[in-house]
Swiss-Prot record:
Active site annotation, chain numbering: 83 (proton donor), 227 (proton acceptor)
Pathway stated in the Swiss-Prot or TrEMBL entry: Amino-acid biosynthesis; L-lysine biosynthesis via DAP pathway; DL-2,6-diaminopimelate from LL-2,6-diaminopimelate: step 1/1
Species: Buchnera aphidicola subsp. Acyrthosiphon pisum (strain APS)
Subunit organization: Homodimer.
Listed transmembrane segments: none
Catalytic activities: (2S,6S)-2,6-diaminopimelate = meso-2,6-diaminopimelate
Family: Belongs to the diaminopimelate epimerase family.
Protein name, UniProt field: Diaminopimelate epimerase
Length: 284
């Protein structure tokens, strides 16, 4: 048995989840870990690997202004810019492993820094920065305000709204999320050539000004139990269009988040739980 592992590398990890959006988290602060997209795909397999939606790497900061660096890889091995549920798990990991004793930390990402604040043992608040409605060369804030951007889909024009929360989101308002064709439309939009890097597609049902239901088709993943940045994106669109109040409860398949946004010129906040499942190690 020892000879089987002789030329393999041992990697310690934690399995975590935020509203059933699950992660493999690796501490790379003292020892850098390089994983190819091929290895990440193998690890993400729920039958032959660890199984996860995203891999999170905890790295030391390259700046005196931030405490840590946060990296995210989808199950297909592609590195992405943002993951809201992952940010909360990232923060809890730092606490559980004794890597910080601060009540509030600033972390760098592939794009903008995020602030993570520990409210209670498992409830974490993340400053997700201000939503960006200038979506590449496709859509603008005015398109969102006028609700007039559409995508050609199956010989019909589908009205939707585009927004970036550090990563790209397409928000579609529906009468009922229960009956929404999430996988069919989500897959079609995500693969549309107008989105060369893909896009997360969300289906939003507005119950009242303080409560929405949301289902999410995540790029390179498929439908997930929850997506924090998608919840932020959907609420941002609703508030911009004056359909929602500044504090909204978002009901996802995996649980609930609270999204707070006071409007243009201010940051958007996400509040929700994070859970540690187990620690383990694997040889690769």
């Amino acid at each position: 048995m020892d000879s089987y592992y002789k030329n393999k590398k041992k990697i310690n990890f934690s399995k975590m989840h935020g509203l059933k959006n699950d992660f493999m988290v690796i501490n790379c602060i003292k020892k850098n870990v390089f994983l190819t997209s091929h290895i990440i795909k193998k690890l993400s397999n729920r039958y032959t690997g660890i199984g996860f939606d995203q891999l999170l790497l905890v790295e030391k900061s390259n700046s005196l202004l931030t405490d840590f660096h946060y990296r995210i890889f989808n199950a297909n091995g592609n590195e992405v810019e943002q993951c809201g549920n992952g940010a909360r798990c990232f923060g809890l990991f730092l606490l559980l492993k004794g890597l910080t004793n601060k009540k509030k930390i600033l972390i760098s990402t592939k794009k903008k820094p995020l602030t993570i604040e520990f409210l209670t043992e498992n409830m974490i608040k993340v400053n997700m920065n201000e939503p960006d409605f200038k979506f590449y060369n496709l859509s603008s804030l005015q398109n969102v305000l006028d609700n007039n951007f559409s995508i050609k889909l199956m010989n019909e024009n589908l009205i939707c709204n585009l927004v970036s929360i550090g990563n790209p989101h397409c928000i579609i308002k529906v009468q009922s999320v229960k009956n929404a064709p999430v996988n069919i439309i989500g897959d079609s939009i995500e693969k549309n050539p107008i989105f060369p890097e893909g896009v997360n597609v969300s289906f939003m049902e507005i119950l009242n000004k303080k409560h929405i239901k949301l289902r999410v088709y995540e790029r390179n993943v498929g439908e997930t139990k929850a997506c924090g940045s998608a919840a932020c994106a959907a609420v941002a669109v609703g508030i911009a269009q004056k359909l929602l109040s500044d504090t909204v409860h978002v009901e996802l398949l995996g649980g609930k988040l609270i999204i707070i946004w006071k409007g243009f010129g201010t940051p958007l906040y996400m509040v929700g739980p994070a859970k540690h499942v187990y620690d383990g190690y694997i040889y690769i």
